[in-house]
Amino acid sequence: MAILINYMEELMVKVSIVIPVYNAEKYIDRCVDCLLNQTLKDIEVIFVDDGSTDNSGLLLEQWCNKVPDIFQVIHSDRDRGPGGARNLGIAKATGSYIGFMDCDDIIDRTMYEKLYNKAAEAGYDMVDCAYYNELSDESALAIGDNITGKLDDAKRSDIIAGVGYAVTKIFRLSVIKDNNIRIRENVIYEDLDFLINIALKINNTANVKEILYIYKNNDNSASHNNREQIKFNDMLAVYKAIDRLKYDCNVDEAIKYAKITCI
């Protein structure tokens, strides 16, 4: 029986990686190289073609045909924005953990192995790593040592106040699915209330103090091209959603900070 359990565990996907793609044909091969070179092999990669008008969808299909055991593609019936595209990927994901990547960015080949191994040490619900932003020439780690381990209200507040980016983290997939946590469609700041909702539901967190994610800031990417999304009502919608979260637990001051960030 123990042998069978070990065998089944070996077959399980450890990390699902969801990648929204919008008119990113010139970045797809580089993105694929980053993923194929990952040292963690028990991964599934879910590309979501978010209504691209270039050859992105065709290129993704070609790669999925070449590497069907790792890659799959979802073709959205409409332009949902990076948040909506990620939601389609979340629904399809089967891994123990889930991570997100933007097609035009770069990840270290050891990123998902290091994040997963850290998560497996003590069953952490969320693990973060440091990132480097090419445009600003700055690096940062959102989840510092002061807010790792088992979470209390003080640590939760610190996470919410400096929540960072979804792409530098992996999350226990069951936390997202069991609590029906989703990302807002077609708005800017789509990460913000998503990450705050997760912070309110996870029990513990950890970090890997290495720069494993390179943020490229390409203007035409799915996450950076506003495609008419930069509107006042978008920010207002996220602001109101964050305001409602303050009733979930004792993190009111952190929620106020997050709302200021949104503005």
Model features per residue range: what roles?
Residues 2-240, 244-249:
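Nucleotide-sugar donor-binding/catalytic module of glycosyltransferases
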Residues 256-263:
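Non-catalytic, C-terminal membrane-associated alpha-helical segments of glycosyltransferases
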